[in-house]
């Protein structure tokens, strides 16, 4: 089966979370907000430091908080829901149903495993938007922050990105 949302405007961004939210807000609400406004309304400025001596890299420093997207939706009064599903099959069924219903859906995963990304570094809180899939070809179509067109990613890479099993994971946010 193949399903893709064709009428989604992708505007490249400097940051994955604020860029994804800006594109989703435009799609669902018709609000054409600047990425900086999205970041500010989401109270995005924060500092988070993770120290994982056995990981690669051994530490991460973030300039934004973990709840920026939810905070933005709350500030704007927009219906927003995040869910965690550690089972890959159940997670795929949930987002598959969203796409079949014509609803682009933001996902979170480790950027390292997304096979269309050339820069390979572990970042398990990368935000991107699922726009469609082709199960016969084993691929999905993703709006990411770099390009103004959908990226093609294997379904296997998407599953590994969302729940790598052996490293820090966002557990299929």
What are these regions (language model features)?
Residues 1-88:
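Cysteine-nucleophile protease catalytic domains, especially the papain-like/related folds used
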Residues 28-49, 86-137, 143:
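Active-site-adjacent substructure of cysteine-protease-like catalytic cores
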Residues 57-58, 130, 164-166:
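Short, intrinsically disordered/low-complexity patches at protein termini
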Residues 69-82, 120-125, 143-151:
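Hydrophobic transmembrane alpha-helix bundles
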Residues 81-88, 128-131, 153-161:
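Short secondary-structure transition/capping segments
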Residues 135-173:
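Noncatalytic regulatory segments and standalone regulatory/sensor domains
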């Amino acid at each position: 089966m193949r399903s893709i949302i064709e009428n989604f405007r992708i505007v490249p961004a400097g940051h994955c979370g604020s860029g994804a939210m800006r594109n989703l807000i435009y799609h669902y609400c018709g609000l054409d907000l600047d990425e900086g406004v999205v970041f500010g309304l989401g109270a995005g400025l924060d500092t988070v430091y993770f120290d994982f001596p056995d990981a690669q890299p051994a530490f991460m420093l973030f300039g934004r908080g973990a709840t920026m997207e939810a905070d933005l939706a709350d500030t704007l009064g927009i219906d927003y829901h995040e869910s965690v599903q550690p089972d890959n099959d159940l997670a795929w069924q949930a987002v598959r149903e969203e796409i079949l219903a014509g609803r682009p859906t933001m996902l979170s995963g480790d950027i390292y495993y997304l096979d269309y990304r050339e820069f390979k570094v572990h970042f398990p809180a990368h935000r991107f938007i699922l726009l469609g899939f082709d199960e016969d070809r084993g691929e999905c179509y993703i709006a990411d922050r770099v390009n103004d067109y959908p990226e093609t990613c294997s379904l296997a890479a998407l599953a590994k990105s969302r729940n790598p099993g052996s490293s820090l994971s966002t557990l299929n946010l």
